[in-house]
Amino acid sequence: MLHTMIQKACKKWFSSDECKIKNLISYMISTGELRDAQIEAIKTYLFLKIACDNKPLYELFCNGAFNSLSEEELNSMELSTLTRETLLSNKAALAWYEYASQKTEKGGQVSVKLTEEIKKNPQNINYETIFKKIFYGVTYSDYLFSLPMGAGKTFLMAAFIYIDLYFAMQNPADSRFARNFIILAPSGLKTSVIPSLRTIQEFNPAWVLPEPTASEIKRQMIFEVLDENKSAKKSNRTKNPNVQKLALHQPFEDLTGLVAVTNAEKVILDGLVRAEQGELFEESSETKDREANELRYWIGKLPQLSVFIDEVHHATDGDIKLRSVVNRWANGEKKNVTNVIGFSGTPYLDKAEKIPVTDSLSVASSDISNTVYYYPLVDAIGNFLKYPIVKVSDNKDSMQIVESGVREFLQKYKDTIYDRPPRTLQAKLAVYCGKGIDFLEEEVYPFISNLIMEYGLNPNEHILRYHDGNKNCQRNEHFHKKIFHRSFCPADNNFDFFSNNFCKY
C-alpha cells in the first residue's frame, strides 16, 4: 500500500505548475499507441526521476516526499500534543502514520495497531530505521512496476529506455537519466522471456518522442543479446563470447545507447572464469571480481547504467544473489548504476514479511515494498485483455473436435493480417496435445497437415511443433531456434503444437 501514497503524490505533481512534462505526455496520448496503464506508469517514472530526483525510496519516504496530511488536518484529529508535535516535526513518522491509516481494498485499515502505537508512544519508534529495513537497506533508486501479462511490460521497458536517452542526451551531466541499459531475464524463463525482450528493438520511439528526435535516438541505439554459451578448449581456459560482445564497445566513457539483454543466471554464477581474449581487456586492479565472473565484471563497467529486471516474482530463489550483484555494481568504485527498475505481474511475496517496529509490535506486509506503480489484473481484464470463449461439444472424438476448431479458425482468420509497424503479424492457433508426444507426432500433426492443405497452406511453412522429445521423437531444434528469433520474422507460422511437456514452462 506504500505505492498508493506514491500515486497520490504523482497525481498532485502532474496537475501542478511544477510539472514540465505535460506536453510530452500529451504527445504520447495523441499517438494513440500506448495503453492508459503504460501512460500512467510513464508518469510515475518521470515523477520519480524529476520531482523526486531519482532518490532511493527509503530516503524519499523519510523526507516526506509522499506525505499528504496537512497541519490543519492533523490539528483536527484526536491526537495528544506529543503525538501531534512528533508528526509535524518528523516526516518519516508522518509517513508511517499516513501509511497505516490508509483504507485497504476491502474497506479496512492497513494497520490499526501501528496507528495506535504511534499515538501512544510516538517517540519510541525509530521511523527511519524501519523504512531502511522495509526497503532492504538499498541506497540507490530501486522501483518496481507491476502490470499483468498482456498489459505491455516489454514496450514499457522500451519507452523508459528512449525517455532516459532523450533526457540524458539533452544534458549528459544529469546522472538521474541512464545512457546504457542491461535487461536481466529470470533464469527459469530464458526461452520465453528473452525472445519477447527482443521486441524492444522493434519498438517505434515515435510513440513516446516526436520526430526527428525519435529517429535520431534510435539510430544511436546498439542492441546486444548476451545469450551465447561459453566455449572451452583443451587448455581448460574458457572463452566467453558475451564478454567479447561488450568489450568491442570500448572505450566506455562516452558509450551511450547500449541495450544488452541477458539471463540473470549469467551474472550470479560464482564459478572461476579465465578468459583468453586478453587483448580486448583493459588492465584493472579488480582482479578477484573479474575472475569470479567476467560478464558481471564487464557489465559493471558500463557508465550511467540502468538495470531492468524482468518478471521479478519469478526470480525469488536467486533474489539474494542477484541483489548482491546489483549492490556491487551500484556501490562499487564507479557507482555507475543510475537505477534498478523491476517489472512484475504479481507484486506480492509468497508470505508476509515482518518488520519489527518495537519490541512488542511488528509490521507485516505481503506487498513487494518497492512497488511504485500497480495496475491490477481486474482492471486489465475490464479494459483490454481478452475474455475466453468456452465451447462445449457432445462429440467424444478428439480429432473431430480438433477439426472443428481448426476449420473455424481458418474460416475466420486465415487471411487476417495485423499491421503493427515495423512488422506484420498473422493470427495464430495453438493446439495443446495432452496425450503426449507420440500422439502429437503420429496422429495430430498428420491430421492437421492434411486439413490445412485443403485451404492452400503448406504444413512445412505454417506449422511449428514444440516438445522436448522422447525416445521415439527428437526435440524439434528448428522450432526452438524459430521461437527464439520470432521477433524478427515479418510473418509467423499460423499453428503452434504443444505436447504435455509444455507444462514444464
Where are these regions (language model features)?
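Flexible phosphate/Mg2+-sensing switch loops adjacent to catalytic phosphate-binding sites
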Residues: 56-81, 166-181, 185, 201-220, ...
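Conserved pre-motif I regulatory segment
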Residues: 13-146
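Signature of the SF2 helicase/ATPase Hel1-core->accessory helical subdomain module
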Residues: 147, 151-169, 190-201, 261-410, ...
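Pre-Walker A (Motif I) flank of P-loop NTPase domains
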Residues: 138-144, 178-179, 425-428
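Conserved C-terminal RecA-like helicase domain
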Residues: 58-60, 64, 151, 212-238, ...
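P-loop NTPase motor catalytic core
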Residues: 117-118, 122, 134, 138, ...
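Surface-exposed intrinsically disordered loops and tails
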Residues: 71-134, 208-245, 277-297, 322-332, ...
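Conserved Walker A/P-loop ATP-binding site and its immediately adjacent core
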Residues: 156, 174-219, 265-266, 432-445
